[in-house]
Every structure is written in structure tokens, then in C-alpha cells.
């Protein structure tokens, strides 16, 4: 049995793993796990012009809970070995498939810089960027109530602070976070920052240094692959017209509200 990756490309960590594996020509079977089942999402958005929809294995809406004891994605299954958590999966793939050194450098100082960003990321960029989608799409979808503009403003202020720190502390005047080549740090950062873009919060506008960094990341992984991986998130607003099963709505509404706090 070969490598299997259980992913939903609505998820930022899943997108980073998908892009990393494809960019490095790692052979794997894409097991599409739908965090919001087909009955919720309805028909998925058509592929963007020039982008081929990712090839997937059978939908795993029934069995995904059996794959990971944590019952969440992403999950890697390599024979009888199962691994969860984005960073752990990225590092496993980089080591097993001996990917180019720039992704996770052998140089101890450069590797430490990647580790530093990955540690900082969770309490800063990841703590703010996803909330834009919860406020603008998911909470209204599951509660039937739009969130007050003050909520979004509060989140955007927190995100702006994180972006300022990102530019000044990590990006500085470099092409990428650790220097002249892309690393896992850049990949983990960019997929997170595309989340607000998908709901109409263009955080790259009026930030030329950040915009240029994004352009370089897109070119490093390939623009076609980049937009293929982000197709679903860039069409996330289409969810607003979906009819939600009342039981699912009752279950998820308080969960989302709790995550926003």
C-alpha cells in the first residue's frame, strides 16, 4: 500500500501538504475528506479556467474517523503508519523523500529559523487569519445571523498587527523568510494568509512587500498548482446559498461561536 494523504483543501494545513507533495513530485493517493459533507456543500465550484481539479480517491466521509484518533485532517497513512498534524507530516515527507534542502535546511541556523517561524505562526497568523472566514461565511451560514462589523474589525486589527510583525521580524528585505529560497515556513504562512483573501479581505493590498513575497511563493511552487489548491477557498462565498441540515446547524453553530472567542 502506497502513501495516502487524507485532505480537505478548504483547510489551510491540508493545502500546504498538498502543494508540498505535488511540487516535489511525491507519489500519493489523495483521499478527499469533506469537513463539510456533500450534503452541506452541495455541488463544488467548477474548476477555475486553466486549472485541473485535483484527482481524488473515493470520498472518505464514513471512514475518516477511523484513520486518525484525533478525527481531523490532515492525516498521512504510509502502509501501517499513520501520522497527524501538519508540521509533523511536512517534516516526514521532506525526510522520507529527501526533498531539496531549501525546504527544511540542513544548516542548523537556517533550520532554526524555519522552526522559529513555525512556532510563532500558531499564536499569531493562525490565531487571526481563519477568523475572517468564520465571521464572514461560516457563522452566518450555520447560525443564520450575520456578525457585527465590529467583530471583523477587531479580527482585522489583530491580523494587521501580526502581519506587521511578520514583515518586520521574518520577511524583512529578503525574498523569502529564511533567505533567497522558499522553505516550509513560507508555505505554511501563505496558505493561512489566503484564507482572508477568499472572503474578500485582501490583506496584500497596500502591502507591497507582502504582495511581492506572495508572488515569489506562487512562482516557486507554480501558479497553476497554487490556484488549483486554493480554488475552493477562493469560491468559499458560494456557500452562503447552501441549505444547511438543521441537526448539523445545531451541532456546529456553538462550536464556531466558541472558536471565535
Swiss-Prot record:
Q: Write out the entry's keywords from A to Z.
A: Cytoplasm, Transferase
User: Principal place where this protein is found?
Assistant: cytoplasm
CDD domains assigned? GST_C_Theta, GST_N_Theta
GO cellular component terms, A-Z:
cytoplasm
The question of whether Cytoplasm is a record keyword is answered with: yes
Q: Which GO terms describe its molecular function?
A: glutathione transferase activity
GST C-terminal domain location: 107-248
Q: What is one Pfam family matched by this protein?
A: GST_C
Where does this polypeptide localize?
A: Cytoplasm
Asked whether the UniProt record includes Cytoplasm among its keywords, one would answer: yes
The signal peptide stretch is none
**Gene3D superfamilies linked to this entry:** 1.20.1050.10, Glutaredoxin
> What reaction(s) does this enzyme catalyze?
RX + glutathione = an S-substituted glutathione + a halide anion + H(+)
List residues of the GST N-terminal domain. Answer: 2-101
Q: What is its EC number?
A: 2.5.1.18
What are the recorded Gene Ontology BP terms? Answer: glutathione metabolic process
Among InterPro entries, the record links this protein to: Glutathione-S-Trfase_C-like (IPR010987), Glutathione-S-Trfase_C_sf (IPR036282), Glutathione_S-Trfase (IPR040079), Glutathione_S-Trfase_N (IPR004045), GST_C (IPR004046), GST_C_Theta (IPR040077), GST_N_Theta (IPR040075), GST_Theta (IPR051369)
Positions annotated to bind glutathione: 72-73, 85-86
Give the similarity note: Belongs to the GST superfamily. Theta family.
* Subunit composition and interactions: Homodimer.
General function of this protein? Conjugation of reduced glutathione to a wide number of exogenous and endogenous hydrophobic electrophiles.
Q: Can you say what this protein is called?
A: Glutathione S-transferase theta-1
Q: Gene symbol?
A: GSTT1
